[in-house]
Amino acid sequence: MRREEIELLAPAGSYEGFEAAIGAGADAVYVGGAAFGARAYAKNFGEEELLRAIDTAHIHGRKLYLTVNTLLKNRELSEQLYDYLLPYYKEGLDAVIVQDMGVFKMIREMFPGMHLHASTQMTVTGPEGMKFLEEQGASRVVTARELSLEEIRRMHETSPIEIESFVHGALCYSYSGQCLMSSILGGRSGNRGRCAQPCRLPYQTALCCGENGRRSEKRKAQELCPLSLKDISTIEILPQILEAGVTSLKIEGRMKQPGYTAGVTSVYRKYLDLLFEKGAENYRVAEEDKRYLLDLFNRGGSCTGYYQMQNGPSMMAFSNEKKTGDVSPVLRKKKEKIQGTFILFPGSPAILDVSCRGIHGFASVGEVQYAQNQPLTEERIRSQMEKLGNTEYEWENLEIQMDENIFIPMKMLNEARREALESLGNELLKPYKREENNGKKRLSEDAGRKADSPKQKNLPIYISCEEKSTALALYKREGIHGMYLNADAMEVCLDDCVSRGMEMYLSLPHIMRGEMPRELLTRIREWMDRGMTGFLVRNLETFAVLRKAGLAEKCVLDHSMYTWNDEAADFWKDQKVLRNTVPLELNEGEIRHRDNRDSEMLIYGYLPLMISAQCVHKNLYGCNHKEEGVTLKDRYDKEFTAKCICNPWKTENTDFCIPCYNIIYNSIPYGLLKEKSQIDRLGVSSLRLAFTIEKPQDAVKIYEEFRAVYRDGKNPPKREYTKGHFKRGAE
């Protein structure tokens, strides 16, 4: 891999941070604007600052990327996004980092030539998902932080598009894009750039020993920060990261100060250059540089992230104590070296030719006079011309060709310098400028056109069961239109349910890493022959695998496959999916403004707050390869269950914990038992109850209560539920 193919990508939360990143050696900088970025509480850039940053980056031969890596509501997409992006597009913005497939679709159609980078918020975990995004027009994928070097290598071998991966900075406990914890608990959504970081808080933990991971007794209670990870620092394994196929090395930290950006970027710049100069076999990192990185920011030490290990307590800080050492990084302003020729002869204009990287700028001003008294010396002229001030340039060489007996006002010298540099800047920036696309597209005015649908009665009710025992308790109950089951329950329930006319869908893992087990593929073919309807899909990799197999038309998208806006829903409709699930973070009014004709709505369930590659059970109590759980009690005495998913595929011959994940569920279930009349007016196509950590007998009772209300019109019983965002919405 050649040096010019590798990019060091630094963060900037302010213009000062941007200058610090460029000055420290970043090849590219990613920033947030006034809207739609995943760091809403950073200072961020106003329009004028951002336009200036785009030009400054290009003058220095660097790139600037804009984050639009949040989920957008219909009105934001239709009324704001185009006008927000247009000036940056015309100025030459290099790429947009995107999470929302509706945003992806809109930018692809409205801003031709704009590079699209698939954000880590898309949770891209494998080669098929990457290949799918390539086909849709992405030029780069930002990998999930949880991937190993081997997984990244397989992705690189599958697709030619660029791979961007995090090499330094904070680690989220959850897979990025799969965290609702801050949103559900406090209304500040990570999917909107407003995460309050509840994962950094202390919790009292205890083992769960009850059925389905529910607590029946407490053991080894302790209080610490069980979800707080150390920061990642990969300076020692840069050769291995590059060898795996990563082309953009991303530093996290748009919320950090410019000094942090400058310090971290300068160290990675130093060692990248050393790596290409001396080769991987001679690559060594000095102890003082490791200490320097820790002095810049330290949360219980650092780790190399998931690149070389699946998870484990060595990655955990178990506290939120942040330390910095006595370091003061120097903030340097990058200056481009320029060459110039200044021609001064009496009776002719003052002509200045300046060049940078082979590109020229010119100025021709006034008229040079013969000196009446004391002529100007070359030294005096040079001294005046070298006053470049706060420009982006510094002289490497200035040749002055002049008559010995001339006079020219200082004002004219300044004018020549200013005009020549302005001309040079224009020429340097000319290749980046774009014209507005004449095919400008505005989103349909009737977005959410089914908002005032006639009141619907007796919507089909679907049931999802994460546990086989719960499925066996429910599958013969009356009134169930269809079920979403894991593989172990599907084998038992399929034939009986199909014989009674029920739709049957295989629930696939929340996270897909590696290939689908051959055993499961064989059984899927058998189940399809026996009448299985399709699949409940929860991530991009799973969908891409099924699409490749010609099964896209049998996919139901879960709420984690976000469709906040109609453009996103249309994107997936174009992929031929059966239906989507109404997002959990929209309120009633926002759902009403959405096209829900092909949408299923969750009306009951313990909401998954986090999907994590870490394991609370393993980190605190050791791994026993059982799908048990740990309770996390917060400062308000709310108890959350962190459940181990040791065998995501639910097959008999799968290696346990390779890979595994945790699901952290909310403390009380979400339930819209009293909201039937409002839901009837939303125009959704079906309803769902999701059973996860309930005891089987409790699941039966809850189902019958909802069936009585939604099918028989009975009054709802008293039971404690959270309404989630149905009434309030996410910030």
Give each language-model segment a name.
Residues T123, Y562-T563:
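Beta/alpha (TIM)-barrel catalytic core signal, keyed to glycine-rich beta->alpha loops juxtaposed to Asp/Glu
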Residues M1-A24, A28-A40, A53-I54, H60-Y89, ...:
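Surface-exposed amphipathic alpha-helical tracts and adjacent flexible/coil segments at the periphery
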